[in-house]
């Protein structure tokens, strides 16, 4: 197995896709949120690498090509937004106010918890962009002096938790309005949460896609201000 990773240019991509396929099959079979395809693919990939004694750099030689698709995939989320453009125009003020509140709440939460836990400045800024898409958040973390690799892990945890528990939270707080649900998913758990929003409905998916873009821009602007709080 180790030789396969060293000699094959696309070994990393192959393992990643097969792992995700396994996750998708388990999700369809058991229909439980815990069987999130991304979460399952991470676990399977790590297990294979550990058992095969393959280091990350060797794996990433082939897997890095998937990273190139990250930004184009994020841009494609504009399609459902375009399809719901009229709905957005009629609710523009409420949408923007809700997203602004969501971003500020996210940043304040990170600040308060970092203070309580006594985190360093580097740890604090590492988690500031936790709720925005990876394509934007990695740049924010690097610019502020955070640990980018840890930021990516925080993105994944935030997204998976939103994907798994987001719908349950909406039920608990009796959030039934499609626009509100979509904005909540997108602003709190970026693209991974948006995948769940798209499953729920077309309007939810479109609003979640909008939330990714707007929340990303607002976070880029406000995170520089919040970075000086610690």
What are these regions (language model features)?
Residues 97-135, 158-175:
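Transmembrane alpha-helices that form the ion-translocation and gating core
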